[in-house]
A protein has these predicted regions:
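Extracellular ligand-binding/catalytic regions of CAZymes and related secreted enzymes
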Residues: 22-27, 53-54, 63, 75, ...
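Short alpha-beta junction capping motif
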Residues: 30-35, 76-123, 204
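Aromatic-Pro/Gly-enriched surface loop or interdomain linker
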Residues: 21-80, 238-239
Length: 242
């Protein structure tokens, strides 16, 4: 009997070794698209295809209208590993607001894009309290923003493979970030320089935010790679390809 058990154990070991280590379950990403101004539904729809084709992720998408009332299905964030938020001036219902605030209070991971700094009209403090930002409007249309890696940020894992590029969208005013924010990228346009991507912790949870995110930004391979890596970084998981 012992001989049989030993043979079975050996067979299992050899089988596992031959097949390699078991793959981790897919990272569950909840994409919240509610910014018509920057066509977040289109950008995140294409980004979802990119993620699911190239990384070990499984996505859920919920959508709302720009400056609208509520985001149907936003409760799905409870079941995800990380929320990617791209919304603009949404007035959440009372129950939806409680859901989002509970998510944040629990210190769950967030990746915020562009208008996420003013995502919720009935929770304006979300920007400072959670994202660590200080959105004060933007400089308006004009010259393209020269996006570069910030000093002392070149070795950050989110930026692996990132190359400077020019963003065609208005530069957000965000000087005066939270004290624990680590600036990863800066943008310069018309002689003005602002932080355009940073990380921080909120209630122990990892936060990444970028004020970039116009439709053409999502076409940049480096920008897409940065966002994908931010999702894994926020959940403290190594980047896992398909």
């Amino acid at each position: 009997m012992r001989h049989v058990l030993a043979l079975a154990a050996t067979a299992l070991f050899l089988s596992a070794a031959a097949g390699g280590e078991a793959k981790a379950p897919p990272l569950k990403v909840c994409l919240v698209a509610a910014c018509e101004e920057y066509h977040s539904d289109v950008s995140l729809g294409e980004f979802r295809k990119h993620l699911e084709s190239n990384y070990n992720v499984a996505c859920t998408t919920v959508s709302g209208k720009d400056a609208g009332k509520g985001i149907p299905g936003i409760e799905a964030i409870r079941d995800g590993d990380v929320m990617l938020l791209f919304a603009r001036r949404i007035t959440l219902t009372d129950e939806q607001l409680k859901c989002v605030q509970a998510y944040c209070k629990a210190g769950k991971p967030i990746v915020g894009v562009r208008t996420a700094s003013h995502a919720f009209q009935n929770w304006l403090a979300f920007d400072k309290e959670v994202l660590g930002g200080n959105y004060q409007g933007h400089y308006g249309d004009g010259p393209k923003a020269d996006v570069r890696i910030a000093d002392r940020a070149k070795d950050h894992p989110i930026l692996a493979g990132f190359k400077p590029f020019a963003s065609a969208y208005s530069l957000y005013k965000n000087t005066g970030l939270a004290g624990d924010a680590q600036v990863l990228l800066t943008g310069t346009a018309g002689g003005k320089t602002e932080p355009v991507a940073w990380t921080r912790l909120h209630n122990g949870g990892r936060i990444f935010y970028t004020s970039l995110g116009g439709p053409d930004d999502f076409k940049d391979a480096g920008f897409r790679r940065m966002l994908a890596r931010a999702l894994f970084w926020a959940t403290s998981r190594p980047v896992e390809g398909r």
